[in-house]
């Protein structure tokens, strides 16, 4: 009985070392911002811009391996946007959907592939930007602004007529839907990335390093899927806002 209590206390101590919600704040005027989220976001943006710049230098008619990779990514984003928004309207939205997908994809993977834990901060620790609810909410709200803008740009004020279609009785439900879209986008992404990092952190604290490796690979796969889901839904919402209802 004593041994069981000792093991339980040991496990509780190790798991308790995995802290959630610790933040380093920067004061900008009267506001406080999460410093580690800004730092890791800048790292992710720098990686995307740097790799894109290097891969697009010295473009050739017969593409190199790096050029092939960039062209494949661009074609993938183009096809994704085209399938959700439509043949006639998709081109202006390729940069937006592509930026969303690449930022979320690299952010998700950075939590597993970049040794953020080696960087010591006065408070908190560095982690994937999408591990913070503020980042995912900002991305979701940006998506909401995008599909409202798309609908108003194409249809004008008649865009709001969708709220009373097919019957005015559905007005409250249709309005509520516009609030649930960003909520579902933000909490789905945040929950999956946070849960993945917590599971790996707990396993590393309990068992040797080799055991959590399969979970890390599974986390990389689910992180890529979450980036794809977010980009697909963002494109689908934009396509829904500009489609003609009869």
Curated annotation (Swiss-Prot):
Top-rank lineage group of the source organism: Eukaryota
Bilayer topology annotation: Multi-pass membrane protein
Transmembrane segments: 35-55, 94-114, 132-152, 198-218, 219-239
Keyword annotations from UniProtKB, A to Z: ATP synthesis, CF(0), Chloroplast, Hydrogen ion transport, Ion transport, Membrane, Plastid, Thylakoid, Transmembrane, Transmembrane helix, Transport
CC annotations in GO: chloroplast thylakoid membrane; plasma membrane; proton-transporting ATP synthase complex
Cellular compartment(s): Plastid, Chloroplast thylakoid membrane
Protein name: ATP synthase subunit a, chloroplastic
Species this protein is from: Chara vulgaris
